[in-house]
Amino acid sequence: LPVPDYTPQTVATREAELNAPPLHAEWHEAARQRHTRDRLAVLSGVWKSILVDRILATVGADRFSAMPDPSLATNPFSAICRQLACLYDQGPPSVTNPTAEARGFDVAGLTRTITRAGYWARMQAQQRLVLGLREVLVHVAIDEGRPLFLFATPDQVVARARPERPDQPVRIEWLRKARVDVAGAVAGTPAVPELRREQWTLWVWDVADPEAPYHRVYALGQGQWRSSGMGAAAEVSGIDVTEQLLGGRFDGDAYPFRRRPTLREERRAAELGVPAVGVPILPWVVYHAAPNGAAIFSAYDEIELFDGTLDVAAKQGFVDHAFLDASWPQRYVIGAVPVGGSVHPDDAGHVAHVPTDPASVLILQKLQDYDGQPMIGQYQAGADPAALQGVVSGQIEALATNAGVAPSDVQRLGGTARSGVAIALSQGGKRDMQRRYAPVFRDADERLVALVATLWNRWSESPEGLAVFGEEAPPAYPESGYEVHYQSLPLSPAEREARRKDVLERLAAGLVSRVDAYAELHDVSREEAAVRLAAMDGPDGDDDDDDADDLREELVAALAALEGALGVDGLPRAAREALEDARDQARAAVEG
């Protein structure tokens, strides 16, 4: 049989088939891009060429030619990531900012804006990508007062960080397609619409030097591209088309993505007689699947699950081959020949074809030149598909365990051996996964809410925003201090009763406060529980509530700790400013 058109040469063209962005010239960046691209293909269902590569490497071309077309049905990598991604299943998380709300800021309005833009709904699907690719980046922009969220996978991005904070990018390079007039950019003339051609471009945001940030766009050539360094020393192998695509330059003070100037920055600017500008920021948020303080990307984490998926999918192809072609006894004939059947033409003439299906009846005729008694027999079946399938299912369950899924949290769908592929988490297992991933995603979500507030404030202060609001003063949102709390999966009646009984018993024994008990029962923060209890108690409630006193004491202690931290010499400027903002918020909460 001829080998299907899945040779390594045709498989190597899958980057072009998937319209993948060009690879970086540095080998480690290119390797990361390729590996991430393969993971994305498996998660997206376009990985047949990758699977064929693995089968060819496992069994060789001759044995592969006898196998059926590879099936993509066995994909534990995608299935497990889908089951683990349950943090946003119960709807949008609650977003609070106790300090800002006490000052009268409309935090609920910002929350509604983000929800209506569809962000939390999209995160239900994007969390699966984060878990599979280990990182996903989100670009935030404001268009006519509405936030826009663009998700970028790591194979489209190169990011750089300072050595002292290797997990926080200060430069992001994003590969995107755009229509540009390269000749006009080289000549320095206005772009001609008829000469614009779609090609890969590199969008760069750089805040490595807070005094000289910039946002630029470069048109890339064919093949690999190069970039190195950051700040003023950065180099890119492309043609600058910033003015052609963005309509201007955004370097230095013209860089638009900034936080609101602090009082200290305003005083410093007034002394120098220049306008006050805030600290430049990147309009990006990086989502991690696990805490990673050593690097921005962790592309090879959990590679066992990805590699194991290719292994079991290749073995599943062999199981299918055994089931279709070797699961019944093979017949043999000595001294006789089958008769009848259908005749099919071929290159050499006409060939008679007699199907030997297990359900067929063979009519045999003795060979004229055979002197002995014809013999008919059969060998045993070449393979036991049930036993082979059991091995594959066991490996899939082992992959789920290695991914952090406890066997007690897995409920199988169906009763067949192959149901091991369709692993589903129980409700209790999903709640465990929510608790596992909430701290990691909460940090990114809180950064994103603060980033939306910051960019919205800058937009509302721009001529476009002022034109929308006219004489009415646009609302301003706080640019820090947000807290995100996720909605956990509901408990069953039995689980709910057991939790209520346990909390009430501990409350009666004096082991927890009312605030802690309410927070545990309703799955909210301690601060929000205190606010709700105060509202329930009403204006005639006990002003000497122990929980309120405890909360105030904690705020006073935090304020003292912040004052002490600010007294340390040699603090970096950014760290000192962050501490000053936190101190101001704590002081306002104590005074309020």
How would you name each of these model-derived features?
Residues 1-196:
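Extended, helix-rich architectural segments
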Residues 127-133, 137-298:
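Extended, regular secondary-structure scaffolds
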Residues 244-425, 466-473, 480, 485-491:
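Extended, charged amphipathic alpha-helical segments
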Residues 425-506:
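Extended amphipathic alpha-helical segments with heptad-repeat/coiled-coil character used for oligomerization
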Residues 516, 520-547:
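Long, highly charged low-complexity segments enriched in Glu/Asp and Lys/Arg with interspersed Ser/Thr
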Residues 548-559, 565, 569:
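Long, hydrophobic or amphipathic alpha-helical segments
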Residues 555, 559-562, 579, 583-586:
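Generic L/I/V-rich hydrophobic alpha-helical segments across diverse proteins
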Residues 564-578, 592:
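Charged, low-complexity interaction regions
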